[in-house]
Amino acid sequence: MTFEMLYSKIHRATITDANLNYIGSITIDEDLAKLAKLREGMKVEIVDVNNGERFSTYVILGKKRGKICVNGAAARKVAIGDVVIILAYASMNEDEINTHKPSIVLVDEKNEILEKG
């Protein structure tokens, strides 16, 4: 049996851009994404702290430092400056659950890393 468990989280990131005309996804600063163990194309859930919206999309790695841009139709669910939580889950068996520790990255309002847990 497997269970859906928290794999990683970027906590309180700030939306820096929203691009309605892009195909889809969320663009995340590559250094920040890698620190959170997020991979290109990985499914993530976005929770908007400001408006309560919750939606799923996939990761695109961005080159610009601090960039968090929601693309495509999901751009209508956020506003620039909104604070979001970016979550990734993984299916794990009981042995994996016992040894797994989620990667949690806390950032400030400029998406600079405050703490990595």
From Swiss-Prot:
Post-translational changes noted in the entry: Is synthesized initially as an inactive proenzyme, which is activated by self-cleavage at a specific serine bond to produce a beta-subunit with a hydroxyl group at its C-terminus and an alpha-subunit with a pyruvoyl group at its N-terminus.
Recite the UniProt keywords alphabetically: Autocatalytic cleavage, Cytoplasm, Decarboxylase, Lyase, Pantothenate biosynthesis, Pyruvate, Schiff base, Zymogen
Q: How is the cofactor bound, in the record's words?
A: Binds 1 pyruvoyl group covalently per subunit.
- Subcellular location as annotated: Cytoplasm
Pfam families in the record: Asp_decarbox (PF02261)
Where would you say this protein principally sits, based on its record? Answer: cytoplasm
GO CC, one annotated term: cytosol
Residues bearing Pyruvic acid (Ser) are: S25
Name a GO molecular-function annotation: aspartate 1-decarboxylase activity
Q: Kindly state which reaction or reactions the protein catalyses.
A: L-aspartate + H(+) = beta-alanine + CO2
> Which residues does the Swiss-Prot or TrEMBL record annotate as the active site?
S25 (schiff-base intermediate with substrate), Y58 (proton donor)
- Please list the GO biological process terms of this entry: alanine biosynthetic process; pantothenate biosynthetic process
| Pathway stated in the Swiss-Prot or TrEMBL entry | Cofactor biosynthesis; (R)-pantothenate biosynthesis; beta-alanine from L-aspartate: step 1/1
Positions that bind substrate: T57, G72, A73, A74
User: How does this polypeptide assemble, per the annotation?
Assistant: Heterooctamer of four alpha and four beta subunits.
What is the official name of this protein in its record?
Aspartate 1-decarboxylase
Give the organism, scientific name. Helicobacter pylori (strain J99 / ATCC 700824) (Campylobacter pylori J99)
Task: Name the gene behind this protein.
Answer: panD
